[in-house]
Amino acid sequence: MADKRVAAWVTAVCVAGLVSAAAGKDWPQWGGQDSKNMVSDAKGLPDAFDPGERRSGKTGRAASKNVKWSVALGKQTYGGPVIAGGRIFVGTNNDNPRDRKYRGDRGVLMCFRESDAEFLWQLVVPKMRAGGKFNGDFAKLGICATPAVEGKRCYVVTNRCAVVCLDVEGLANGNDGPFTDEAQSYAWPIGEKYIDDPAGPRVVRDPGKPVKLGPTDADIIWRFDMMKEVSVWPQDASSCSVLIRGDYLYVGTPNGVDRSHNRIPYPDAPMLVVLNKHTGKLLAVDNAGIGDRIYHGQWSSPSLATVNGRTLLFYGGGDGFCYAFDAEPEPGKGGKPGTLKMVWKFDCNPPEYKTKDGKPVKYQKKHGSKGVLSPCEIIATPAFHDNRVYVTIGQDTRHGVAPGCLSCMDATKTGDISKSGLIWRYTALDRSLSTPAVADGLVYAADYTGIVHCVDAKTGKAVWTHDTKQHIWASPFVADGKVYMGTERGYLWVFAAGREKKVISRIRMDGAVCATPVTANGVLYVPSHKTLYAVVKGAE
């Protein structure tokens, strides 16, 4: 460990001048900013790097060209890293355990020191067991949500359909309350069953033996169980990345169908909740009432912006509509939660995706189908730029590939703006999981089939496309005149940003790149399924 620290210190000294010349900003949340537009003003980022050879242990891979450090994660990583206050937080799974007391399939949030990747602590959450009508925590996915950090607190949605507030110091500085039952919370349950009672989801659970806590365990400040508190029935995964504004925490719920995929157990459950960030108290729920219109599940994340003096919260619904809500909830009465009032909604499915020959087109949920035209939900995050919202539609990747759509809508409208708010639609892409990025009059988007699209932001006309021939889960990230794009086959593509298509480099990684690269304080962070890389031009 001492050798690692010395090597990291020497590397830091060598590249300090290079880093200080770049933008010195943290990246504290999904998208880096409330608009969720995946664009950074960082400069001096590398065009390429060499990931190096795999090391044994937990330190990732051997140092190589333009790599400041690398550190091992689990073996499936879908949530992006965030960097704040000298720490890095990233969700992964437990296939590469850092603590022998935590075995088996679990969701994990790891915390590292930003300067040298020293492991600080981890949140290790037991999986929810599938069975009967329940399949809300798909095997091996880990914690898929990207956390949000503000000051001394880290907020994240866990794989157990719960929002937790964590102390960024972990348990190293003691177990702060009010939540103090971490030992039992982290225990592997002996038995567990989820029942969809009419009154709300019910859990029959034998909690198992409490674990012995240590300084590298997470310190939970408070916990909000969405199944218990607002009757959410999660489908496949809980993946919303929370958004902080003032004292409010905005969270999308993972409510969806049950294991039969033909029934929504709790259609009255909210799409969005607002919590007090200090206490976890439920303050408000949305009034869109989409529960019985959910196609499959809800996996989008909220974005936020001020439009004509009014702060709006945007969210991609499980019914294929993009919604805008007034970000200031109306207070509740008689002990009931307040209301997030809908300002507008926009149908992101073109009419021909929903109706054919005067008849409704059924939602296509057959695994392995190809080219079948059908309506889709929104999995990506709505991206805001210059009073416009950009968002793609998509489906579970197991449903196969089929036509998708990138929509651009006018955020200044009100009501049902499916027609009045439509600026353009781009239908030359397939279903997408990716959040678009808007920079210098261009929109960069990717579809699951592996095609990267560059579209004119004003007209919606294609500027260029590039087929990576590799499935894409991640989102395009734009910085320093480059577009970084990861693929499931394990490559990081680097394109020149602009109207002329140019592939700068294609970097072979050690595993799938399903999370989105980010930059903070002059460093480019690239997560593969297995490893997080800190990339700096000139590092050796």
Describe the role of every protein-language-model region.
Residues 7-8, 29:
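Short amphipathic alpha-helical "recognition" segments used for binding
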Residues 22-540:
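Noncatalytic, solvent-exposed loop/strand surfaces
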Residues 9-18:
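Bacterial N-terminal signal peptides
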Residues 1-7:
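N-terminal secretory signal peptides that target proteins for export/translocation
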